[in-house]
Amino acid sequence: MKTFTAKPETVKREWFVVDAAGQTLGRLATEIATRLRGKHKPEYTPHVDTGDYIVVINAEQVRVTGAKSSDKMYYSHSGFPGGIKEINFEKLIAKAPERVIETAVKGMLPKNPLGRDMYRKLKVYAGAAHPHTAQQPQELKI
């Protein structure tokens, strides 16, 4: 019996909406990354993007445990000497709450062109409203 390999043109993708309100950041991000990769499906194939689309709402209400809200740091670099910038979780969640979830999920995806395609299927919104109602996303309980 030959090993089954999913073909990109036969992959059936679904849309899911996840409410991040009150969820722990890491536990939420691992479940989202698993579904973006398609590892929850029986037809998962490592070299084919078999994942679903994920819409995350209420990103501003995601939480972290312990003292991470003041201790967890996010770094960025301008590319110029001395151009490193750092911001903690508290300030980033106030400034750009979408980036917190996007950064956590992106770090859990492959670092190659296939991983970038998977990352494009993630849509994160700070509030409860999102523009993807036409896709009729199903609610995903995490």
UniProtKB/Swiss-Prot annotation:
**Keyword presence, Ribosomal protein:** yes
Q: Name one GO molecular function term.
A: structural constituent of ribosome
Which keywords label this protein? Ribonucleoprotein, Ribosomal protein
Q: Which GO terms describe its biological process?
A: negative regulation of translation; translation
What are the GO cellular component annotations?
cytosolic large ribosomal subunit
**Pfam families (alphabetical):** Ribosomal_L13
Q: Which family does it belong to?
A: Belongs to the universal ribosomal protein uL13 family.
| NCBIfam families in UniProt | rplM_bact
Which function does this protein serve? Answer: This protein is one of the early assembly proteins of the 50S ribosomal subunit, although it is not seen to bind rRNA by itself. It is important during the early stages of 50S assembly.
The protein's matches in HAMAP family, at most eight in alphabetical order, are given as: Ribosomal_uL13
Description of how the protein assembles with itself and partners: Part of the 50S ribosomal subunit.
Mind telling me what this protein is named? Large ribosomal subunit protein uL13
